[in-house]
């Protein structure tokens, strides 16, 4: 659809649950999660041709696929061995690489614009908070320390901010913070607002 909500065009048939659609850097492809026949699969969809392709068929729950800044990989999380970790898939050779390996729930990964870092949420501290790490999974740092639960972090295309969802006292908030966790600002307050997404210029959520 257009950014004003008009000119809707359906890309999927609507007979299965489809979640977290994300554009590639050229806006020609979309990756998303579909539960066709109750099986979680990661798809690629060519917007011009309408061609859909399964690129990931994993045995456990899969969450939030998203392109790398160069469009060559998809980053996601899925459940394996009784826990949820972050993985990448090379779209050329379909090789899957495990990025985190921790007895916690790591999910909702998002690359920095230069591809050198990843932000994600994890409950490894005891409750859900936001972390950053290098793209190879090293140097993990927690950056959120406020009250409540933090999730769905997404790096701004400008590289200066991370947007997130916060749940506190039964309410959802959309907020932003600097990449070191400082300067947290809550922008909206509602019971059903979550999972922010940036405009390409990094100025609008």
Label each residue range with its predicted role.
Residues 1-19, 45-63, 89-107, 133-151, ...:
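Multi-bladed beta-propeller domains
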């Amino acid at each position: 659809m257009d950014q004003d909500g008009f000119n809707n065009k359906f890309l999927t048939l609507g007979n299965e649950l489809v979640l977290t659609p994300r554009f590639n850097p050229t806006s020609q492809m979309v990756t998303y999660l579909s539960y066709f026949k109750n099986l979680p699969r990661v798809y690629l969809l060519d917007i011009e041709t309408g061609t859909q392709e399964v690129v990931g068929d994993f045995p456990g729950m899969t969450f939030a696929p998203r392109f790398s800044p160069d469009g060559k990989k998809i980053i996601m999380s899925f459940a394996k061995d009784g826990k949820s970790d972050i993985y990448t898939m090379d779209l050329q050779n379909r090789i899957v690489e495990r990025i985190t390996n921790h007895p916690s729930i790591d999910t909702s990964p998002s690359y920095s614009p230069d591809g050198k870092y990843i932000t994600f949420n994890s409950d490894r501290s005891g409750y859900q908070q936001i972390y950053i790490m290098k793209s190879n999974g090293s140097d993990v740092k927690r950056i959120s320390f406020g009250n409540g639960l933090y999730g769905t972090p997404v790096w701004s295309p400008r590289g200066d901010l991370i947007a997130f969802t916060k749940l506190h006292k039964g309410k959802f908030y959309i907020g932003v913070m600097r990449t070191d966790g400082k300067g947290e600002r809550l922008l909206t307050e509602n019971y059903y607002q979550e999972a922010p997404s940036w405009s390409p210029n990094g100025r609008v959520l």
